[in-house]
Every structure is written in structure tokens, then in C-alpha cells.
Amino acid sequence: MHHNPLLVGLLAALPLASGAIITGSHVPLTGYNLSWTIDDTAATIEVTVAAQTTGWVAFGIASSGGMYGADIMMATVDDSTGAASVNDYHAFSQVAPIMDEQQDWTLVSGSQADGWTTVTATRALVTGDLQDWALSATSSWTLLAAMGPSDSTTAMHAASSRTSYRVNLFRPQDGLISLIDTQVRTVPSVQSLDFQA
């Protein structure tokens, strides 16, 4: 059997096989567990955040190491009723994020138990919303992970360590690609990681 080397090379270069399901997980911040599933057929990403807080949790992506230009998913679980909610935000600087005009994250589930908030939400890889980043296997991004002390999404997150490193969401088996930056910050603080999505 003869193989066409050009065809073999092209197939090897494809970032995602048609119909592929990719799953991964990471602990970017102490008390903050992130997992994700990318469904190529549905062209969606499902994100689960489990954080040691009874306040808000957030997951975001940005083109740089900070909040400027960030595309953010913020979620809460009401302490009294247990009702969960998720909202789509964007940020221009180190101030409170602004809610998007178009809401592209859909809540799958949310719960609180033993001081932990767990929220799962999904969105299209490409939403068509100018306030969202389009996710693809060939793009590089910074991942933002944060949590707050209360359900008020205007409540600032506490001071903590900040770490930046590269992770490819479409190739989670590669693990940590490179450590970029570690420093202690004061409020506002955010844990950030560069990844290719």
C-alpha cells in the first residue's frame, strides 16, 4: 500500500478531527478546579468551574495577560434558593466587567455544597458576537480564573497569587506548555494562564 506523503502531512496537521470530543481539566488556582469539553460536531465548549467559595465564579479568555479585552463568563448560585445563573461579560481594564448585550453562555447546572460552588455552562466556539472571542485550535489566548466572596458580581475578588502559563484546550494531553509569570498582586487579583484555543 502506498501513502501520499502530502496527504499524510495534511491530515497530521489538522487540529481537530471531525466529530471529535476533547476533554481536559486544570487547577489554575488553589480552590478552583476547571474542566472543559470541546465538541467539534456541535462546535461548542462546555466549561465546569468548581470553586471553594459561596460567591461568584468566573472563567475568561483574553488576548493578553490581564483583563483588558477579556471575554468572561460569570456565574452564581443563590445561597438561599440554590438557583444558579450565568452571564456573559467583557472587560476593558482592571475594573468590574460589563455585561454583554448578547448573552452567549447557557447554564447547564449549578450547585453549592460544603462551601464549594460548581457551575457548568456551554457556548458556541464561534458566537458571532463582537464582544466574544472566537475559539479555534490555532488561536492563542490567556485564561482568566477568579472567584468572589459573595454572589454580588460587583464584589471584588481577594488578593492572591497570579500565575501565567500556556495550555492548549484542544490538546489537553500536552499539559503545561510553559510558565510565563508568577507574582503576588493586590486587589484586583486574577489568576491567568495563556492557552491556545
Task: Specify the residue positions occupied by each region the protein language model found.
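Classical eukaryotic N-terminal signal peptides for Sec-dependent ER targeting/secretion
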Residues: 1-11
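Extracellular-facing/secreted segment signature in eukaryotic proteins
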Residues: 9, 15-197
